[in-house]
Regions:
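Non-catalytic, glycine-rich low-complexity segments
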Residues: 1-33, 111-129, 133-134
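Aromatic-rich carbohydrate-binding modules that target alpha-glucans
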Residues: 31-83, 92-113
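Short loop/turn segments at strand-loop or loop-helix junctions that form parts
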Residues: 40, 147-149
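Extracellular/periplasmic catalytic domains that process cell-envelope and extracellular macromolecules
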Residues: 135-140
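Structural recognition of the beta-strand scaffold that forms the well-ordered cores
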Residues: 143-145
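Single conserved hydrophobic/aromatic residue that forms the stacking wall/gate
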Residues: 151-154, 158-161
Length: 161
């Protein structure tokens, strides 16, 4: 797998609330990745005190992908029950499977190691202030684009010097 082609972070255009209940999660990969699964759920499903609890998450395949010139853009919409979400990805190529976490990639053997801390991606809170809500009046507005090239004057003598 080409690890340099895989990119995600839990902010900005990669993970954001679509509305008050839905969360968009995007992942960029190379064309060698054939299937992607996301494991997601509430960060506190396994408890809040640490210890030996194991967070598992719900497994779901990401089916929607956009073909860009050099990458694939995988997109899914999640509905976190408590408006917070913890997740990681399972990436499949023709011959191998890797798990993608905040701190890098793990093989199937590495993910099952006793005592390993899994640094999952986390959307701590879907804040209503982060939801884009366009006012209704925008649909009735006429928008103009001013082409600045029309307003460029001839070069003056000072511009040439």
């Amino acid at each position: 797998m080409d690890f340099t082609g895989v990119y995600h972070k839990a902010s900005e255009q990669m993970c954001y609330p679509l509305n008050e209940d839905e969360l968009i999660v995007n992942l960029k990969t190379g064309y060698d990745v054939k299937r992607v699964f996301i494991y997601y759920g509430d960060p506190f499903e396994a408890g809040i005190l640490g210890g030996k609890e194991q967070w598992a998450g719900k497994k779901e395949e990401i089916c929607f992908k956009k073909h860009l010139r050099h990458h694939l853009w995988w997109t899914t919409t999640l509905t976190p029950r408590f408006k917070r979400c913890k997740y990681y990805f399972e990436l499949h190529t023709e011959e191998e499977t890797w798990y993608y976490f905040e701190n890098g990639f793990l093989s199937e053997e590495q993910i099952g190691m006793e005592g390993r801390m899994l640094q999952c991606f986390v959307m701590p809170w879907m804040n209503p202030a982060d939801v884009n809500s366009t006012p209704d009046w925008v649909n009735d507005t006429v928008w103009y684009q001013i082409l600045s090239l029309i307003h460029i004057s001839e070069p003056t003598r000072l511009d040439v010097i």
